[in-house]
Structure formats: structure tokens, C-alpha cells
Amino acid sequence: SLVVSSAGDVYSFGPGSNCGKLGHGEFEDTNQLTPKVIEALAGVKVRAVAAGLFHSLVLTEHGAVYSFGQGEFGQLGHGDEECQYTPKAVEALRGVKVSSITAGSRTSLAVAVNGVAYGWGCEDARLGLGLTEDQLTPLQYPTEQLCVKV
């Protein structure tokens, strides 16, 4: 689980054995029974968080997106299927000011302030992009209809 404090800090807690989904580093083989601040985000003001099955997303006050946890289906958006044990910026969204994020079990979605939506992760008809393979980096949805929020 993830929470954002009034100061914009992110805390996580819960089972910690799945590929760094809590964001505290590689050696998370025990449960985190109480909220613990994610040190890798120190100094970053966070506006929103989203938790998938074994991955997490963070949205900063400046519209940047970070991800961490299991990347087996590309749901982290880093161009690979590796685990990420601490938060890492989604480089494919650099320069895009994101206003909203959500995480599915094996997918991630973001909406930019201009209404353009992006999706990445397990394709298996979960993203609605008409693809047959997992999407390892954010892919822009067609812009015939702009989005407000995910």
C-alpha cells in the first residue's frame, strides 16, 4: 500500500517480497508492518500514487512519473521487463506533464494535462491498443477523444 503525506512524501507498507514493490530497495524480504517513507523520493513533492498487483506509480507535483516493483510485462515503462527496487523516472514520458495516473494488475496508464492518454504493460487486451505484444514503454492512445482522468 502507498500513501502520500500532506508534505508530499510517499510512505509504503505491506508484503515486501515481490520485486521491490514497496520501493525501499532490493532486500525487501519481510513485511513492512507500518508506513515507511520511501527514501529514494526524498526532496520530491508527490501529488498522487497508484498501486498495481506488484508495481507502483508515483506522480510528482511537476507532472513526472516514477515507477518501481515488478516489470515482467513492461508495466514499469522502462523499456525492459526487469524489477526496479527503488523509484525510477519513466524516461519515455520526460517532457510530458502528466496530470493523472492509474495502475492495473499488469498495466499502467497516464493522462497528460493536454488530455492525451498513454498506456503500457501487458497487452492481452488490457490496454485496448489493439496490439498483440506487451508494451514496454508508454504508447500514446489515438487522440480523437481527449481524456480528463484515469
Region spans (language model):
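Eukaryote-biased RCC1-like beta-propeller repeat architecture
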Residues: 1-150
